[in-house]
């Protein structure tokens, strides 16, 4: 199923019983977080708060609160079908010419999808039906959530931040939280390795003292939203990838303030600039780790215009101790990662990011081991392959006889196949998430790899244990008798 815009997606969710409308007054200050948190933990529906206290603009929450809704948003019928999205990304990351007529025919569906990649620019768009400028630019008129009691201020959480670097023709879409500090100002919290921060750094180096154009789109169509959180190859824009997911070109429109282009169907758009040397101390906020983070200085985004659709919807979320919406996104996107990794490392049989690991901090990998030391090669490969895994602190590697999505099997492999000295790899002074207060220095810490594979000659001098297995004929005999037994 493909969706033209967010409203089309919500209409389809409502038909499936996956959207709940709340027509009683609910406050964006803490109450919406508590409701969405309970809904998510029950695998409940998305929720549209139609009467947010003190506001007339409804608030959409828990939109991607189940992996199934993430899959639907990406145009797939099931979570398992997201493997096909991963295969498409793997092909686009390292395309191969057809090996013959049959191979060319097999690749024809992909080539047809590629035709939907270039976005289509419109002269006018729904997202610009209403325009606030000058004194009318006032973020307090939007029902922006305050998520946790210790949060310093209200926080924009689901904005798609649009940037462009001086060396790139394509634009970058990223999701960075934004603390409201004035009617027309927010703090743009982007980490140094993220696309928006890299674009901004490059711009400042070439254009010192110049204001940097930025736009933030709220309530885009699901393909565009999810494109911003998917490991899209650097050569591909999120708008192009959204077109592939949707099966139709992404419609964009030029901002009224500068030349950046935003999703034409977005519900609300913030347009403006980051002015030179304007920074502010951000936080503390409750985060996906389950803790309040430290304060840190980031650039200030000054909003010159706010444009929106008629009767707009404000899309929001919260982050907290898993499970939260980012953790659910991680569960779904895990299926996208598997084919990407398998194309680069054919020995990998499965890859799992447990949601309890705060989306990406712990990864478990199963593999077909081929030589001594192979597990360590896989560890280093994962840490360096995708930007998303640069901050993964722990990697556990097992043989392919272990179901890595079953913690009982993983723990069994660790406790029976690991010697702590021989099989623990420690790498010091590596990039670490700034939110990770466990690291001794902000942004710099260590990583651990655990080799829970069976050991080969050269890795041990002892005879290795053999796994106990019942005789196959006996199992077949008991299968036949089972219905006759009184169990």
Curated annotation (Swiss-Prot):
Its cofactor is prenylated FMN; Mn(2+). Mn(2+) binds at residues 172, 238. Prenylated FMN binds at residues 175-177, 189-191, 194-195. It is a peripheral membrane protein. Catalyzes the decarboxylation of 3-octaprenyl-4-hydroxy benzoate to 2-octaprenylphenol, an intermediate step in ubiquinone biosynthesis. Keywords: Cell membrane, Decarboxylase, Flavoprotein, FMN, Lyase, Manganese, Membrane, Metal-binding, Ubiquinone biosynthesis. Binds 1 prenylated FMN per subunit. PANTHER family: 3-OCTAPRENYL-4-HYDROXYBENZOATE CARBOXY-LYASE-RELATED, FERULIC ACID DECARBOXYLASE 1. Pathway: Cofactor biosynthesis; ubiquinone biosynthesis. It comes from Nitrosomonas eutropha (strain DSM 101675 / C91 / Nm57). It catalyses: a 4-hydroxy-3-(all-trans-polyprenyl)benzoate + H(+) = a 2-(all-trans-polyprenyl)phenol + CO2. InterPro entries: UbiD, UbiD-like_C, UbiD-like_N, UbiD_bacteria, UbiD_Rift_dom. The active site is at 287 (proton donor). GO terms for molecular function: 3-octaprenyl-4-hydroxybenzoate carboxy-lyase activity; metal ion binding. This is 3-octaprenyl-4-hydroxybenzoate carboxy-lyase. It comes from the Bacteria. GO terms for biological process: ubiquinone biosynthetic process. GO terms for cellular component: cytosol; plasma membrane. It is found in: Cell membrane. NCBIfam families: PRK10922.1, UbiD family decarboxylase. SUPFAM superfamilies: FMN-binding split barrel, UbiD C-terminal domain-like.
């Amino acid at each position: 199923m493909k969706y033209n815009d967010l409203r089309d997606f919500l209409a389809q969710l409502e038909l499936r019983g996956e959207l709940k409308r709340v027509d009683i007054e609910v406050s964006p200050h803490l109450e919406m977080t508590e409701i969405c948190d309970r809904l998510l933990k029950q695998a409940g529906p998305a929720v549209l708060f139609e009467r947010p206290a003190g506001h007339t603009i409804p608030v959409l929450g828990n939109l991607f609160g189940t992996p199934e809704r993430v899959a639907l948003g990406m145009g797939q019928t099931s979570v398992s079908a997201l493997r096909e999205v991963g295969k498409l990304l793997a092909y686009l990351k390292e395309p191969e010419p057809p090996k013959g007529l049959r191979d060319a025919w097999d690749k024809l569906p992909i080539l047809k999808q590629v035709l939907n990649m270039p976005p289509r620019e419109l002269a006018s768009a729904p997202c610009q039906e209403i325009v606030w400028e000058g004194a009318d630019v006032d973020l307090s008129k939007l029902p922006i959530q305050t998520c946790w009691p210790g949060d310093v201020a209200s926080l924009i959480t689901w904005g798609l931040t649009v940037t462009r670097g001086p060396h790139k023709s394509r634009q970058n879409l990223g999701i960075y939280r934004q603390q409201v500090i004035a009617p027309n100002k927010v703090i743009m919290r982007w980490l140094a390795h993220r696309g928006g921060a890299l674009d901004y750094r490059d711009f400042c180096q070439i254009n010192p003292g110049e204001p940097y154009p930025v736009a933030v789109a709220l309530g885009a169509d699901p393909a565009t939203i999810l494109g911003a959180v998917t490991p899209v190859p650097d050569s591909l824009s999120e708008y192009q990838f959204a077109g592939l997911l949707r099966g139709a070109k992404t419609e964009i429109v030029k901002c009224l303030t500068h030349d950046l282009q935003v999703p034409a169907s977005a519900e609300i758009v913030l347009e403006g600039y980051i002015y030179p040397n304007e920074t502010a101390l951000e936080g503390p906020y409750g985060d996906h780790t389950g803790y309040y983070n430290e304060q840190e200085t980031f650039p200030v985004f000054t909003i010159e215009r706010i444009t929106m659709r008629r009767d707009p919807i404000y899309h929001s979320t919260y982050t907290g101790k898993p499970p939260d919406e980012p953790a659910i996104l991680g569960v779904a996107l895990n299926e996208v990662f598997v084919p990407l990794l398998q194309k680069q490392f054919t020995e990998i049989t499965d890859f799992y990011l447990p949601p309890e690991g705060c989306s990406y901090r712990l990864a478990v990998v199963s593999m077909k081991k081929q030589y001594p030391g192979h597990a360590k090669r896989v560890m280093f490969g994962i840490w360096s392959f995708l930007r998303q895994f640069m901050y993964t602190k722990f990697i556990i590697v097992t043989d392919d006889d272990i179901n890595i999505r079953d913690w009982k099997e993983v723990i069994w492999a660790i406790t029976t196949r690991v010697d702590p000295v021989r099989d623990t790899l420690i790498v010091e002074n590596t990039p670490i998430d700034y939110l990770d207060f466990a690291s001794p220095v902000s942004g710099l810490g260590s990583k651990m790899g655990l080799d829970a594979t069976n050991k080969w000659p050269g890795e041990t001098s002892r005879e290795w244990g053999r796994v106990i297995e019942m005789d196959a004929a006996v199992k077949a005999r008991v299968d036949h008798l089972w219905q006759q037994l009184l169990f």
